[in-house]
């Protein structure tokens, strides 16, 4: 599913304030000098590239999962269009408190860090999954390239036990090394496409690459959910369904999944550091361990249906972690912290 931009709900009210930095544009719009589309193009644009960790989906029956995968938008730690409470205190809601902007949600269920042109399996095709290369391609095709790009993808790439030969299941070291290196190479290839295009823009572009989530603490919460289900089978009714999609989530394979995720995060960190020396002056590229260090050890952070994806509270934890490391990116784009906490907007 291709991304559909979401504009801040109160953006006209915000920029109608004479103190707003976008007020001159608002006057031009009100006087009929520019269209609403042209006015919106002047607002900061924030994009999210990712997998199901960045969406509000969860797994249940095949057809229900299929329907949610195709229709679920704006219900995650990045973007939530529901009122709060009881909605999610998403990154977008936090940003909306101090600047109007346009959110571009590219993330989707089942997305992989892939080799461009790689054929997808049947399951991903019917879900219309957009892998990393496809999501990057979507952004490159936009008429208004984003100012801020958040990237959190690769969680489906650490399913090391999937189709693993028996010998590698018992001695997985070479497989883990091979998978982490392959992910880095594919990730770097797509980052080069993204950065090359960003360098041609006439505005600053900040890219923030998040490490994979803290799987060690995540599985602590998952183990609690499993015990609860043992005591009451009505809890987490689709908890075991997880294993149909991610073999490595089985208890016997988790420790090496945790190892692989850490290896991947080190590869991503190194890749970002090595790329920084080659950037154009209008680009900032950073690695963040905010999600990799977030405490996900409570069962209530898991969705009550599948015990796999995040619950509303889980999305709140991820949102807070992700937002906490945005400061340097926002400052690069001209957003500064005000005297009383939060941030204030400067020109993009």
Task: For each feature predicted by the language model, list its residue ranges.
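Conserved SGNH/GDSL esterase-like catalytic core that processes O-acyl groups on lipids
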Residues: 64-192
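Structural recognition of the beta-strand scaffold that forms the well-ordered cores
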Residues: 45-57, 102-107, 147-152, 157-159, ...
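N-terminal secretory targeting modules
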Residues: 1-102, 145, 329-348
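Short, solvent-exposed beta-strand-terminating loops
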Residues: 49-63, 211-235
């Amino acid at each position: 599913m291709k991304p559909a931009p979401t504009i801040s709900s109160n953006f006209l009210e915000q920029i109608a304030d004479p103190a707003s930095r976008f007020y001159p544009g608002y006057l031009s719009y009100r006087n009929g000098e520019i269209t609403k589309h042209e006015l919106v193009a002047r607002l900061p644009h924030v994009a999210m590239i990712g997998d199901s960790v960045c969406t509000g989906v969860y797994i249940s029956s095949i057809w229900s999962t299929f329907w949610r995968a195709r229709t679920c938008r704006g219900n995650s730690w990045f973007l939530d269009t529901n009122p709060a409470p009881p909605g999610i205190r998403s990154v977008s809601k936090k940003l909306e408190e101090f600047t109007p902007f346009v959110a571009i949600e590219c993330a989707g269920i089942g997305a992989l860090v892939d080799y461009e042109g790689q054929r997808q399996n049947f399951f991903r095709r019917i879900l219309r999954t957009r892998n990393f290369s496809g999501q990057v391609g979507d952004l490159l095709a936009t008429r208004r390239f984003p100012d801020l790009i958040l990237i959190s993808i690769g969680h489906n790439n650490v399913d090391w036990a999937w189709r693993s030969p028996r010998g590698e299941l018992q001695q997985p070291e070479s497989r883990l090394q091979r998978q982490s290196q392959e992910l880095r190479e594919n990730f770097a290839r797509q980052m080069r496409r993204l950065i090359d295009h960003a360098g041609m823009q006439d505005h600053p572009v900040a890219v923030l690459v998040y490490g994979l989530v803290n799987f060690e603490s995540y599985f602590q919460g998952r183990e609690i959910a499993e015990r609860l289900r043992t005591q009451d089978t009505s809890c987490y009714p689709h908890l075991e369904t997880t294993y149909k999609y991610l073999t490595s989530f089985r208890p016997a394979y988790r420790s090496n999944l945790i190892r692989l995720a850490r290896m991947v995060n080190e590869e991503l960190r190194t890749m970002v550091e090595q790329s920084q020396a080659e950037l154009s002056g209008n680009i900032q590229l950073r690695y963040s361990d905010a999600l990799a260090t977030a405490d996900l050890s409570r069962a209530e952070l898991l969705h009550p249906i599948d015990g796999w994806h995040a619950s509303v509270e889980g999305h709140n934890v991820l949102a807070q972690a992700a937002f906490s490391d945005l400061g340097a990116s926002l400052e690069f784009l001209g957003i500064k912290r005000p005297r009383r906490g939060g941030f204030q907007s400067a020109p993009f």
